[in-house]
Amino acid sequence: MKLRNLFLLIALSLPVCLSAQTSKQIYLQRADSLLQQILTLYKVEKYGLLTETYPRKPEQRITYTANTGVVVNQQEVSFLWPYSALVSGCVSLYKVSGQKKYRKLMDRQIKPGLDLYWDSTRIPHCYQSYPAFAGHNDRYYDDNDWVAIDFCDYYERTGDKEYLEKAIQLHDYIYSGWSEELGGGIYWCEQKKESKNTCSNAPATVLCMKLFKLTKDAKYLEQAKKTYQWTRDNLCDPSDFVYWDNKNLQGKVDPAKYTYNSGQMIQAGVLLYQATGEKRYLKEAQQTAEGSCRFFLKVQPIAIGEMKFFPGTSWFNVILFRGLKALYLVDRNEAYIKTMIENVDYAWNYTRDENGLFSNDWSGHREEQFKSLLENACMIELFAEISELQFKHNKQ
């Protein structure tokens, strides 16, 4: 056996007994080091934004245009979606650590960068998929979901009303995408109203629940219930309680399944249970958690044998983790959440490149030359959120 494999055997077979404080520090250090590396490697000095990949793909082009979808320009900076993963990471780091440097970074650098994506020329106002300096681009309801959720979390920690007001404004934009076609539901893209997607409706439910908690306005709770039920009735596979991707306006379901869709419905169910006390929401969250782990976890070979891994879709998996963590904090079932933690511990220890960056595949079987901002920035949130959890042992 090679020496490296021997070390791997030791690392994976022996539980590392650590104090909760030590474990928290380890995960926070991982999150912080990745944050600093991303801000350095992906930086676009001209705009104060970040590139889509590192190294930058020379052929990268803007494809999300508001009218035709035709490539119009070379892509200088990332789309909103990857940039929002950085927002999520910074919010999580500040939320769990309380360190002022993260609030300073958010308020003085990351939020001003995010503002460059703001479209103030079309009503309702919202964030568009590419910075406004490049003209009009597509506006996605789910892109705005993720940002609004982050703003709710940040407001809850800081008390800065600017973020709550912006979250409410984004909520109003998102629900402008609700229509009675298919009996309800929110479209995916404002410029392509062709389908109602789990990825626009499930996080909208989570957003409504967060706004209900922050404002005590019952309209958000009722809206959350309605959106949750529409999504469950139309997009939940009754055979395993895992969520399909979308339903088009002809009523045809796209049966593709992605971890983040189920993750947001798990989180939505937990939040509804906590607010209403209705046990069916908790039961449905537990059913989807169990079904998701059965469906998505696949055995992969590693140097010393085999290990179960979630798919090679890091950001999607992080959104699943949001749901699994919310569920764990209620029912204290460690099984699902610890599998994800073991995955990312393995990825940290054995699959990063010379710059400390990740490919999509946590098992390390598929290496990528161009490291995605989306798939790396999301890991900041994941490590920060793991740092709050206390188990008897973690394999780090």
What residue spans do the PLM features occupy?
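Surface-exposed cleft-lining segments at the edges of enzyme active sites
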Residues: 188-193, 215, 247-255, 276
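Extended ligand-binding groove/face enriched in aromatic
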Residues: 100-211, 218-225
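Well-ordered alpha-helical scaffold segments within catalytic/enzyme domains
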Residues: 84-100, 146-160, 203-217, 264-278, ...
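Oxyanion-binding "anion nests"
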Residues: 258-297
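CBM-like carbohydrate-recognition segments
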Residues: 23-84, 96, 101, 112-142, ...
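Bacterial Sec-dependent N-terminal signal peptides
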Residues: 1-23
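Active-site cradle of extracellular carbohydrate-active enzymes
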Residues: 198-204, 208-212, 220-269
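The canonical alpha-helical register within tetratricopeptide repeats
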Residues: 37, 108, 112, 169-173, ...
